[in-house]
Amino acid sequence: MVSTSDFKTGLTIEVDGQIYVILDFLHSKTARSGALINTRLRNLRTKNIQEITFKSGDKVERAIIDRIKMQYLYASGDTHVFMNMETYEQIEVDKSQIEYELNFLYESLEVEINFYGTEIIGVNLPEKLVLEVKETVPGVKGDTKTNAMKDAYLASGYLVKVPMFIETGEKIIVNTTEGTYVSRA
């Protein structure tokens, strides 16, 4: 059990059968009702962000999340196969659990898969990945005065905004958390 006074960003807790990670929290004192802790939490199953207020001194169950290094192997219908890097055991993850992550996955990419017991909670991608631009319109010199952006499609079909000088076939660095262009590779 974890007391609300021990809350910190990144802590995983279980509330009403749901598993949350604390995104941020704020202690606030009121004259009559005592201290309250306002938290912003992400549900690890649904990915929704929720705000929950706890009373000071409340205790919640700590959720132990195991992070295991895996390698993405291939897609098989609506499932995607990953291999444990230590035991070589293969697991299948349903497409619905990793819809956003599919925009950046490619064969042999090393990721971390989060487990709550035997349940797969999510996939952690590296923060930045080098990916190839499959299609973009050519930029014309003198098009703009400022740093204008254009659309570029990655191999997965994911659309990212890139500067005008990026061409089809170039490798770029993409921030997987925000899904944005960082720089040329």
From Swiss-Prot:
Record's keyword annotation contains Cytoplasm: yes
Any Gene Ontology biological process: peptide biosynthetic process
PROSITE patterns per UniProt: EFP
Keyword match Cytoplasm: yes
Pathway: Protein biosynthesis; polypeptide chain elongation
Gene3D superfamilies xref list: 2.30.30.30, Nucleic acid-binding proteins (2.40.50.140)
Record localization: Cytoplasm
Primary localization: cytoplasm
InterPro entries linked to this entry: Elong-fact-P_C, NA-bd_OB-fold, Rib_uL2_dom2, Transl_elong_fac_P/YeiP, Transl_elong_KOW-like, Transl_elong_P/YeiP_cen, Transl_elong_P/YeiP_CS, Transl_elongation_fac_P
Highest taxon listed in the record's lineage: Bacteria
GO cellular component: cytoplasm
One of the Pfam families matching this protein, by short name: Elong-fact-P_C
GO molecular function list: translation elongation factor activity
Keywords, ordered alphabetically: Cytoplasm, Elongation factor, Protein biosynthesis
Family: Belongs to the elongation factor P family.
Protein's job: Involved in peptide bond synthesis. Stimulates efficient translation and peptide-bond synthesis on native or reconstituted 70S ribosomes in vitro. Probably functions indirectly by altering the affinity of the ribosome for aminoacyl-tRNA, thus increasing their reactivity as acceptors for peptidyl transferase.
Protein name: Elongation factor P
